[in-house]
Amino acid sequence: MMTTYLMRCFFRASTFILCFLLLSCTVKAQQKLNVAIAGLTHDHVYLIMNSYQKAEVNIIGIAESNPELVERFKNRYKIPDSLFYNNLPDLLKKKKPDVVLAYNAISGHLAVVEAAAPLGISVMVEKPLAITVKQAERMAELAAQYKVHILTNYETTWYPSNQELYKEVKESNTIGALCKIIVHDGHQGPKEIGVSAEFLSWLTDPNQNGAGALVDFGCYGANLMTWLMDGKTPISVSAITHQIKKDVYPNVDDDATILLEYPSATGIIEASWNWPFSIKDMEVFGANGYMQAVNDKTLRLKNNGKDDYKIYQAKTSKPIYSNHLSYLSAVLKGEINPANDLSSLSNNLIVVKILAAAKKSAQTGKKVILK
């Protein structure tokens, strides 16, 4: 009798545990984003593909017209034919994703928003938002009209070092009032580091990318400075550009220096395809000290009266700020308001204005006043 009773208890407990595990797996699966991909020509697409391989995201459709690219991705990631469409409108007639992720040329971002927004589908594009102010403002109009999110993804948004620097400077007032921000972003050059031919073709086309290093890397500094300056537009923008490797990049700049004027601070953006190694860092000077986000994890701090720098590792970011998928999920669920975040539409409208003014300044040799 006792043995039978124990067996029944064990069976019931096992059944309960099994049901619980199945339910947990189902909930977890439901929490994964269902995404559609617009374009495969931006090499950052490999990040989402890696997430797909790890079962961190559901890709329910891919819009790409280049048959060679389609075949390449189909074979490499074992993606079924049924997920591929020749264009985004056709895809969205058949599928209803949570969000569209754009991995196409910057000049094509507006078309992605025009296809998705009227259907109530939010969009995240790779940096920057657009190549012209007119395009960016049209995207903002569509976002407001159809009540969708238009977000921009930057690698540096998910750096724990940048997140911690912001908290120290803006919330803890560790170095006092900001007076200067310097941001360096660059590498040896896209061709030199071996980006794909499809990516290189539009990255070095001023009609598709807007410029060269000025846009490709200048956008990072404009994004971070707008964030640190509380979403304020700079008073003026000045810039100089160079074509150091004219034989490699004949149609666009490969080095840019951009100066942003604020009422009580100066921003300096250094962007290049000519550096001996890859770098993404940020320095901030305050009334009482200095901080540097040396890379994605390391910080450097020095206060007045101190002889040595304090060098330390940033704390791990909150889960929703650890990567673009977690952030997107939180935004779409209404768990956070992206109003002034690095990915926000308001921030990135200003970024596009800064880049447009920088191009004009470099062309004319004059300071451009922003209204």
Residue ranges and their predicted role:
Residues 1-30:
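Bacterial Sec-dependent N-terminal signal peptides
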Residues 25-77:
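N-terminal Rossmann-like dinucleotide-binding module
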Residues 37, 125, 150-152, 293:
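Hydrophobic residues in well-ordered beta-strands that form the structural core
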Residues 37, 99-101, 330-371:
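C-terminal helix-rich "cap/oligomerization" subdomain common to oxidoreductases
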Residues 69, 77-142:
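Beta-loop-alpha module in the N-terminal Rossmann-like domain of NAD(P)-dependent dehydrogenases
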Residues 138-156, 179:
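Rossmann-fold dehydrogenase core element
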Residues 159-240, 244-248, 365:
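Predominantly a Rossmann-like dinucleotide-binding segment in NAD(P)-dependent oxidoreductases
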Residues 223-298, 326-337, 357:
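Contiguous beta-strand/loop segments that form the cofactor/metal-binding neighborhood of enzyme cores
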